[in-house]
Amino acid sequence: MDIAFIIDPIASLDPGHDTSVALMEAAQAAGARVWVTEISQLLIREGQVWAALTPIQLSPVQLVDGQWQIPQPWFELGALEWRPLNTFRAVWMRKDPPVNTAYLYATYCLDLVDPQTTLVLNSPAGLRHANEKMYALQFTSVIPKTIVTADKQRIREFVQQQGMAVLKPLGGKGGEGILFLQAGDRNLNSMIEISTQRGQLPVMLQEYLPAAKEGDKRIILLNGEPIGAVNRIPTGDEFRGNMATGGRVAAAEITERDRQICQTLAPALRRDGLYFVGIDVIGGYLTEVNVTSPTGVREIDRLNGTRLGQQVMAWLFS
């Protein structure tokens, strides 16, 4: 059984952090032969999608005294081969954002993979449909007060009404470009103009949730069901808890409120073929739905002694 992973260059991944590596290790442990490729290596010929793929053998990380120990080298590559993606049991689309033109074109290629032979996850159509900031807006009962606009006056009014707000670019990742806005800040107009490219680019504004100081919970969902969570806590003067911005991680429980949020999302996630998802929850409110390359599995496994990748593969092969 062969499984393909469409990823960023393998040497750029961090095996002690990247969920893609955890999934590849789990697939290998389950007896699958793992192959890797990149979006630039896709080909359509006679209506069939091919890829230049490389088989990979991984040396799994080991948990020692609460930390991941990484073997060196941690992977070994075989010979490059061109293969139709229809010959794989599953194809994981795990290319990191941004969702740019090249990314979108790759999803159109993946539309041609035969669903009778191969599961593509997440669904290419679902990836196009689910902007990671805006997808949450359909679930109005579980999100904080939110607007999306490029209009400076509307943004100023929202900040004035809330007192404090968080501005998010619609295409960012890892906390990039997120700003804390406060009524009365003399730099407010400048921050709005820069973020919206002088009113040409819409951004998201959400009410500031004081619970953010206590952490931003990442919950991993598999086919709509929560399977693990980790809390990401801001450090120093930083208001963002993202691991990419230096947030520290702590073990987290999946609460009844978290389960209610997941139940609210589950039908839409299943409808859109979004099988492996990471949602962000602050103070009992859904703030983002991460579908492109959600992370957090390594941190959850390290803090809880779990192996979520094994659970994912058991579902995939069932």
From Swiss-Prot:
Span of domain ATP-grasp: 133-317
GO terms for MF: ATP binding; glutathione synthase activity; metal ion binding
InterPro entries: ATP-grasp, ATP_grasp_subdomain_1, Glut_synth_pro, GSHS_ATP-bd, GSHS_N, PreATP-grasp_dom_sf
Cofactor comment: Binds 1 Mg(2+) or Mn(2+) ion per subunit.
Pfam families recorded: GSH-S_ATP, GSH-S_N
Catalytic activity: gamma-L-glutamyl-L-cysteine + glycine + ATP = glutathione + ADP + phosphate + H(+)
Record key words, sorted: ATP-binding, Glutathione biosynthesis, Ligase, Magnesium, Manganese, Metal-binding, Nucleotide-binding
Record has Transmembrane as a keyword: no
Residues that, per the record, bind ATP: 159-215
Pathway info: Sulfur metabolism; glutathione biosynthesis; glutathione from L-cysteine and L-glutamate: step 2/2
Cofactor: Mg(2+); Mn(2+)
Record-listed E.C. numbers: 6.3.2.3
Statement: the UniProt record of this protein carries the keyword Ligase: yes
Stretches that traverse the bilayer: none
Entry's Gene Ontology cellular component terms: cytoplasm
Gene3D superfamilies: 3.40.50.20, ATP-grasp fold, A domain, ATP-grasp fold, B domain
Positions annotated to bind Mg(2+): E288, N290
Domain of life: Bacteria
Similarity section: Belongs to the prokaryotic GSH synthase family.
UniProt-listed NCBIfam families: glut_syn, PRK05246.1
Name under which the protein is recorded: Glutathione synthetase
